[in-house]
């Protein structure tokens, strides 16, 4: 009943222009959710800011209202006209059918260097994904070396240091208790995974990520 198609309205269009969409992140999230429900969706590249469209149901319309996403209900004739406009070879536009919601991993530790558990709002990537309501898993060195990246379609990285040299804050913080604790914990992790040095651990992790990308995995790095 929830996904029964309306006979009077054919499609929902989610405009993505900066002045038309009230919540861009939630718009991405609702589109991910729609695809995950097995409903066909389209990404209209270079059309109205890269809009999204999918078949109309009252249930989907209600979900858009709950999430605060701007949308339009358009008729079947309007949808056909949009598709026709996009297909014009003179325009740099395309309607891409979205068929599978990607499984996402974020490379991030459970604790920050000071020993505090990292919350979604402490991390830029997890903050955005959590707010958009896009599901993701956190992975770190152990999961990468255990080959678990193969379970994911996308991998997100931050400003990562894979040298294992602990050099980022050494000059100003090298003698502080939190810095020494972080170094000790990282060395313990390396030892538990069979590495005598953190630099060797990080090299192995970087190589695993390289293999993941070479095998067709998508990586987004900052």
Language model features: what each stretch is:
Residues 9-124, 132-134:
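Hydrophobic targeting/anchoring helices
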Residues 12, 16-22, 53-62, 80, ...:
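Helical hinge/lid and interdomain linker segments adjacent to catalytic or ligand-binding clefts
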């Amino acid at each position: 009943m929830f996904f029964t198609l309306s006979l009077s309205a054919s499609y929902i269009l989610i405009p993505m222009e900066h002045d038309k969409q009230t919540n861009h992140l939630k718009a991405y999230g609702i589109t991910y959710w729609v695809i995950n429900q097995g409903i066909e969706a389209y990404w209209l590249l270079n059309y109205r800011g890269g809009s999204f469209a999918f078949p109309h149901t009252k249930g989907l319309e209600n979900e858009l209202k709950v999430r605060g996403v701007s949308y339009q209900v358009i008729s079947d004739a309007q949808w056909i006209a949009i598709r026709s406009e996009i297909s014009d070879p003179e325009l740099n536009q395309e309607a891409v059918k979205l068929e599978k919601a990607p499984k996402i991993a974020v490379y991030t530790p459970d604790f920050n260097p000071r020993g505090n558990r990292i919350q979604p709002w402490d991390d830029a990537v997890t903050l955005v994904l959590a707010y958009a309501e896009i599901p993701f898993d956190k992975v770190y060195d152990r999961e990468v070396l255990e080959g678990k990246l193969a379970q994911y379609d996308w991998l997100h990285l931050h400003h990562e240091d894979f040298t294992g040299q602990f050099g980022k804050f050494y000059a100003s913080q090298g003698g502080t208790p939190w810095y020494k604790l972080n170094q000790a914990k990282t060395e313990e992790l390396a030892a538990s995974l069979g590495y005598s040095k953190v630099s060797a651990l990080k090299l192995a992790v970087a190589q695993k990520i390289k293999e993941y990308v070479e095998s067709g995995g998508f990586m987004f790095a900052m």
